[in-house]
Each structure stands twice: as C-alpha cells, then as structure tokens.
C-alpha cells in the first residue's frame, strides 16, 4: 500500500496539471471502487475549479472552488496518470504518457485551463482505493480524519508528545508507530527503516522509551529525528516502487534502492561495525525487518 511519501509524491506530480484547472467533466466508469462512489459525485465535481491539492496522512485531497474537498485513497494499487489533450508539454517534473492497462481506468478528470485540455486518469487494478467528497470545513470531523495523529513531518510530533502516547504501554514499538492515532501516515516500510536508523528494536515495549516520571528518554528524541529523516529522504527520492506504486509521471520511485533493512532478510546489517544480519519476523500479520544485533 502506498505510504505517506508515495502519496506526497503523487500530489506534487499532479499539482501542475490539476491546480487551477476546471473540471469540465468527471467520468465514473463504474459504480464503485472499494466502496460505492458518493451520490451524485460526478455532478458535484463537474464544472468546479480545483483550487489546490493537499495531503493528510495517506489521503490525497482535491480542494474545489465551492468549498468541498474530494478525498482519494490509492488503496493497494491505485495511481493517477496525466494525459495531454494538446501538443504542448505540461509544466512540472511529473508528466508521462499512458502507462497502464486502460481496462483498469475507473475515474477520469476531464480538465481545461492553463495548458489546454487534458485528462487525469485514476487507474486501480485491485480496486481497493476509494473516493469521497465532504465540505472542507468538516474535513477534520470526517471518519477518515477525526482520530488521526499528527503528521510525522509536522511540528506537533516530538518526543514529549510520543512520551505521552507511549507511557506505560506494553505494546510493541513498531505496532505503536503504525497506529494512525499516534502518528498519521507512517507505514510498514518507513517504520522499519526509522527503527533501524535509531537502533531500536521493533519488538521492545513502547513504554520503555519513557521514564517513570513520564518524560521521554534520549532514545525517543533519536526516534523522532529518524522518522523525520527517513520520510524526507523518501519524498526526495520519489517514494518506493514496491509492487504497485508508481509516480504520477508513470516512473518508479527510487527510495527502495536505499533500504537498509526492509526486504533485506539475510543480508549484512549496514551499521558500521555491527556485523549482524537482517532478520524477518511477522508482527500483527506484517513482515518486520530489523537487525537484532544493533537494534535493542
């Protein structure tokens, strides 16, 4: 499933083609994805101007000029593709011709303005993605967002905040980090990588990073810094291209070439002087990769 860096990369890739454009028609080629489309979705979006693109956790947000926001989740295999309706190239770094099987094109944004007519196509072979529309003022109260924790790159995330969340918790550290109520948008790949960078075991209790008085230990400061770094590095690299993720320009992300532990079972740990080997275990049905020699 695309994680925060992948969705951020898609948002940045779509922005030059979508922001400021008018949706002449929203074409729905089926009645549902993972869930049924909201009633009259095509009518509510058609004719509107896109005033901005945003992201919250793993959700792409398309702000419209009538005060509504279209919410899109990529699910397991969803992606967007930009198609020009004229010969002139679209601005921005992310632009590519058609790149996926058209039989899985389920939603088409027909756009005009700026560089001329164009289409932004949502393609989803597995159909685990979904879309919804809600008033922008009501976004924080929407069931998708009301319980989300702070963004991993935002100012709200700090060691003191995590100490409050983790205090007295016997829950494994990795599970606590994947809990979207604690931190929004973190997923399996980047949690594994952040834990390796901070030399923390995914199986240790989250509460062990907090003093008896409720203050964060130094290791928690290092963990927060590692989370910020790994997310920033992944966004800069365009995300990871594992399995179905693809950028808005049709190319692949390159952060997977920088993995230190994820999907590296049996390989040597990259920590200088460690000498350990990357192991794979299963936690809550998900693969965890870590080095037992240097992650404590």
Swiss-Prot record:
It comes from Rhizobium etli (strain ATCC 51251 / DSM 11541 / JCM 21823 / NBRC 15573 / CFN 42). A zinc finger (FPG-type) spans 260-296. This is Formamidopyrimidine-DNA glycosylase. InterPro entries: DNA_glyclase/AP_lyase_DNA-bd, DNA_glyclase_Znf_dom_DNA_BS, Formamido-pyr_DNA_Glyclase, FPG_cat, MutM-like_N-ter, Ribosomal_uS13-like_H2TH, Znf_DNA_glyclase/AP_lyase, Znf_FPG/IleRS. Keywords: DNA damage, DNA repair, DNA-binding, Glycosidase, Hydrolase, Lyase, Metal-binding, Multifunctional enzyme, Zinc, Zinc-finger. It comes from the Bacteria. Involved in base excision repair of DNA damaged by oxidation or by mutagenic agents. Acts as a DNA glycosylase that recognizes and removes damaged bases. Has a preference for oxidized purines, such as 7,8-dihydro-8-oxoguanine (8-oxoG). Has AP (apurinic/apyrimidinic) lyase activity and introduces nicks in the DNA strand. Cleaves the DNA backbone by beta-delta elimination to generate a single-strand break at the site of the removed base with both 3'- and 5'-phosphates. Belongs to the FPG family. GO terms for molecular function: 8-oxo-7,8-dihydroguanine DNA N-glycosylase activity; class I DNA-(apurinic or apyrimidinic site) endonuclease activity; damaged DNA binding; zinc ion binding. It catalyses: Hydrolysis of DNA containing ring-opened 7-methylguanine residues, releasing 2,6-diamino-4-hydroxy-5-(N-methyl)formamidopyrimidine; 2'-deoxyribonucleotide-(2'-deoxyribose 5'-phosphate)-2'-deoxyribonucleotide-DNA = a 3'-end 2'-deoxyribonucleotide-(2,3-dehydro-2,3-deoxyribose 5'-phosphate)-DNA + a 5'-end 5'-phospho-2'-deoxyribonucleoside-DNA + H(+). Its EC number is 3.2.2.23, 4.2.99.18. PROSITE patterns: FPG_CAT, ZF_FPG_1, ZF_FPG_2. Binds 1 zinc ion per subunit. DNA binds at residues 104, 126, 169. GO terms for biological process: base-excision repair. The active site is at residues 2-3, 58, 286. Monomer.
């Amino acid at each position: 499933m695309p994680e925060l860096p992948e969705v951020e990369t898609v948002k940045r890739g779509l922005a030059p083609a979508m922001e400021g454009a008018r949706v002449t028609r929203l074409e729905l080629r089926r009645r549902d994805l993972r869930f049924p489309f909201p009633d009259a979705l095509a009518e509510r979006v058609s004719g509107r101007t896109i005033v901005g693109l945003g992201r919250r956790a793993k959700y792409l947000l398309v702000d419209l000029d009538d005060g509504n926001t279209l919410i899109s989740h990529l699910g397991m295999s969803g992606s967007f593709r930009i198609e020009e309706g004229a010969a002139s190239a679209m601005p921005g770094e992310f632009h590519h011709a058609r790149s996926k099987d058209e039989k899985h094109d389920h939603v088409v944004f027909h756009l005009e303005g700026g560089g001329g007519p164009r289409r932004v196509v949502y393609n989803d072979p597995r159909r685990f993605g979904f879309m919804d529309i809600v008033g922008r003022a009501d976004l924080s109260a929407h069931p998708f967002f009301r319980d989300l924790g702070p963004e991993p790159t935002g100012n709200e995330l700090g060691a003191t905040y995590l100490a409050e969340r983790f205090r007295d918790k016997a829950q494994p550290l990795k599970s606590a980090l994947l809990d979207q109520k604690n931190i929004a948008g973190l997923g399996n790949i980047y949690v594994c990588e952040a834990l390796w960078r901070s030399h923390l075991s995914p199986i240790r209790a989250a509460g062990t990073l907090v003093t008896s008085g409720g203050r964060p230990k130094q290791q928690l400061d290092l963990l927060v810094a590692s989370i910020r770094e790994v997310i920033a590095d992944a966004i800069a690299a365009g995300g990871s291209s594992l399995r179905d993720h693809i950028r808005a320009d049709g190319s692949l992300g390159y952060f997977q070439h920088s993995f230190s532990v994820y999907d590296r079972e049996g390989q040597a740990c990259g920590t200088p002087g460690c000498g350990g080997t990357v192991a794979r275990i299963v936690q809550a049905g998900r693969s965890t990769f870590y080095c037992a020699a240097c992650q404590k």
